[in-house]
């Protein structure tokens, strides 16, 4: 097989694709972009209950003013009004400007009119120009070299700093910066001087500088025509703060002497990155010092850290006042604060100390006044925001305590998280005073404990707050000789029995394993509180209800079977219903030592899991190995009519096996899921060598070359082969991306994600051999379908959510989610492709990467982002599915317009979109504050799956391939209608690589 030119992913494209991947090596911004015009989640839901969620002419209702988010929104609107003055290089003429404003205001209604005039159905995107994904940095050497000759040293005066600060504060990209960040950037700008006629920027030339006019006048020239002037205090080159791109105008000096302040994009973003990283680390450290949060998980602490708000106070300014209602926790980051009660000074708070923690739990007035003694900076979080990103704090803390205790329990340790959550949800929480007998033998309790504990009573309990002593009863006569000298015994006796202290349990500990394992065993201990105590009690009836009527042994057996089957691909992605039915179909069979279980050469029809005992595997008379408890064998017999490759015999006096027959399995798993499993197992079984591949045709072209359909000659299996030119990779400085792409693809194993079979390399190319996906792009499918209905949108969005959820569970950010990067398989189910932008996240990322229309605000800005960026793209896709155009920048002519619309544009819904559940979900996904974006809280994707939009959708049947896809592909669909045989290729034996190609040694 010879060399092909290539693309870094298995993709097919339109003749004029709107695509491709991206990896702009630049820093991007932070978790707190400007808030959306969409109401915050709670507000949005409130508005949904009104008469209408859409205002006249497709306008979305505006949220009322007052909250910090809404105040930021108003500031954004004011900034938009100032933009024409602040960025005059984008002005052309007054008439053109007014026309542009009209277009922006009527953008969505104009789309509606087009749709109404069309016969039907509504079309996706219309004639919009969609930007390609940002891939690599443009060369700015020419501009950089020219500007170097104008650079001068200058000490900034107070008036200089004031001018710079004012300009930065009104800049859209800088709108989310705090005072410290603006100050750092003001100190980072450089001074440039110019003479009349000097050129600052050239139209079409790539640039990386953002400028503020210090003095003089400059003219704006577009296509050799002067269209505007730039005066002192005005700025230009805003797009350069986001990424290097071609200048849209030439800027030339008009004055005899003129000067600019300028900052390079790399300096700008590196400054923000350093500040953001340092602030996050500091805030995380401060949060760790709050004892109140010590029972939170690391992930929960990170969520809170991302949501912390920085607040500054001047000397003498009250931070909180005694008697006022409190709902905010404050941590001092710098400065000092005086605590006073009833006008009496009590103490002084220093850096790292905190106050107001009770305000997060209880509706009670402040117990003291706290006043800044000097300039003081605090980080804070309010109860409302905390509830939105984490949930009710007390419930979260208690749940964490119980979850950790269950995971350490000998009985519950093997329970899956979902089962543990159900157990936690069934407990009863009760408070007890000091020295209270909470439980006694045979479940005798004080009368105030209520009839709750009648029948089988309490079987298990957790200590949430306080401390309890646990006593055992012993026969007094048999232990009298030792009890007098035992410090752990109690002198109180009941009849001929006396109490002996056996344990003292504190917060986070639990008791009752023996009573869970023996449901009918009478409670034989005494539990007493050592102080005010809060317990969570699990009763026998609650335990039975939670376990679905099964006893604990049956549940443990079920969990063991579940854990074992989920290790195998053949069972891993069955639906929950299919899995439950399969596990219940297992029967127990016993064999005695020496008895053959299966015989070499016979046709297999059973799958086995070892419950107890040991088996030996024999090839002929040769002993190969032994298998023990919870090992398994024979799974291939469920899918294939194959002869057994070995004999398996019992190797202990008794061997108990869980067994399922093939005919039972085929009654449970059938149709599309069975076909999918057969194809996947066959693909995994095939041992592919490069020399055995035959090129059939080209199916796609991209940045690095082509994608080819190839056939494996020995088995006739077909695959897609992406052929990546090493020279192109090196020229575009993409070595790390290609290597990471391979690493991530090799780890992926999900039915809705493209499967990498293996990789090859030779002197000129790298090769990705993947499964062949023949149904075409989702991008084309939604254009065939027209505007998607509720079920169609549910099907595609839910499939995408499951694929991205799988990646996020492995801490992988996809970062270029869009319909072009999703293919349909022959059954109409989705396959996520193109991992050229994916990244294994460790902390926060700062790289600007992805396709502009689908970028989250925090990616565009410069202060870091996490996995939340992918969740924003869910909202863009859903909007495109159901509304037609893109939500932001649909009619934009350049990337700056797209970015401006994403950061500050209104989210407007066409009049023909009437599904209020869908509208609400879009608003919550397209929330500019990632901390409160649905799917980004500590609940993760559970909040999306349980949203009202999916209330009538069966996620389980989707996973089991038991739903009808919106579009069933007819035949095979490829973008590239290439001639048979693809490109002419030369044979290559894989000659030794030169040293400079060491980066691709893993291929």
Curated annotation (Swiss-Prot):
Needed co-factor(s): Mg(2+)
Residue ranges of the TM segments: none
Compositional bias (Basic and acidic residues): 86-109, 127-141
Lipid-bearing positions (N-myristoyl glycine): 2
Keywords, ordered alphabetically: ATP-binding, Cell membrane, cGMP, cGMP-binding, Cytoplasm, Kinase, Lipoprotein, Magnesium, Membrane, Metal-binding, Myristate, Nucleotide-binding, Palmitate, Serine/threonine-protein kinase, Transferase
Pfam families reported in the protein's UniProt record: cNMP_binding (PF00027), Pkinase (PF00069)
Positions of region (cNMP-binding domain 1): 173-289
Low complexity bias locations: 69-85
Reactions this protein catalyses: L-seryl-[protein] + ATP = O-phospho-L-seryl-[protein] + ADP + H(+); L-threonyl-[protein] + ATP = O-phospho-L-threonyl-[protein] + ADP + H(+)
Regulation: Activated by cGMP. The cGMP-binding domains acts cooperatively to activate PKG. Inhibited by the antiparasitic small molecule 4-[2-(4-fluorophenyl)-5-(1-methylpiperidine-4-yl)-1Hpyrrol- 3-yl]pyridine (compound 1).
Lipidation (S-palmitoyl cysteine): 4
PROSITE patterns associated with the record: AGC_KINASE_CTER, CNMP_BINDING_1, CNMP_BINDING_2, CNMP_BINDING_3, PROTEIN_KINASE_ATP, PROTEIN_KINASE_DOM, PROTEIN_KINASE_ST
Region listing for cNMP-binding domain 2, in residue ranges: 292-391
Catalytic residues as annotated in Swiss-Prot or TrEMBL: 816 (proton acceptor)
Entry GO CC: cAMP-dependent protein kinase complex; cytoplasm; plasma membrane
EC number per UniProt: 2.7.11.12
Effect in UniProt of substituting residue 635 to A: Partial loss of catalytic activity. Severe loss of catalytic activity
Residues annotated as domain Protein kinase: 693-950
Binding site for ATP: 699-707, 722
Assembly description: Monomer.
The protein's name: cGMP-dependent protein kinase
Gene this protein is translated from: PKG
